[in-house]
């Protein structure tokens, strides 16, 4: 954990010795590249990629989209239900990469419960470390390129950073203590 690797090393050089049943979560501040890294890692290793952010953005539920547009987190029970549904469809034996969950202490417990009921456990938590300044630059660039509405409002961006600092970043200690945390220089 003390050694910080680049995400290119993790994706391109690191071979996962036993892919069967590998469950990986990707965490990091807004704009750190969670979606990009998740997709590359899943593609390289034949894993299923589950992005809770994409699930919400593609949802027909306008209330969920309004919550995101304000920079708030979706309620834990809704996120857990969405993840449980997607994991139920995934090929767990081939491995899964999850980005966007967990984001709260309660969600870590929910994730443990969901995985336990499916007969698998979490193998790694990859933390994409990136400064707030660089994250903000990436978010604004993404807003311009992809037209993501939730990336265009500076107040919403600040709220997302605050939510991350207060609710999500503290989760890293749990995964560090369980020796599942891999820190990546994003």
Where are these regions (language model features)?
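Glycine-rich phosphate-binding loop of ATP-dependent small-molecule kinases
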Residues: 1-186
């Amino acid at each position: 954990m003390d050694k910080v690797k680049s995400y290119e090393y993790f994706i391109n050089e690191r071979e996962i010795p036993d892919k069967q049943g590998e469950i990986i979560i990707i965490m990091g501040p807004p704009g750190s590249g969670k979606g990009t890294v998740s997709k590359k890692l899943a593609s390289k290793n034949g894993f299923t990629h589950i992005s809770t952010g994409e699930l919400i953005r593609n949802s027909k539920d306008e209330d969920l989209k309004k919550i995101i547009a304000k920079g708030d987190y979706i309620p834990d029970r809704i996120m857990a239900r969405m993840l449980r549904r997607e994991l139920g469809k995934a090929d767990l034996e081939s491995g899964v990469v999850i980005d966007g969950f967990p984001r709260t202490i309660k969600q870590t417990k929910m994730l443990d419960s969901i995985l336990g009921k499916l007969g698998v456990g979490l193998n790694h938590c990859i933390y994409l470390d990136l400064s707030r300044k660089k994250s903000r630059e990436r978010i604004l660039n993404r807003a311009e390129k992809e037209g993501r509405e939730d990336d265009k409002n500076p107040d919403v961006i600040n709220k997302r950073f605050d939510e991350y600092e207060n609710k999500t970043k503290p989760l890293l200690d749990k995964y560090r203590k369980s020796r599942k945390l891999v820190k990546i220089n994003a």
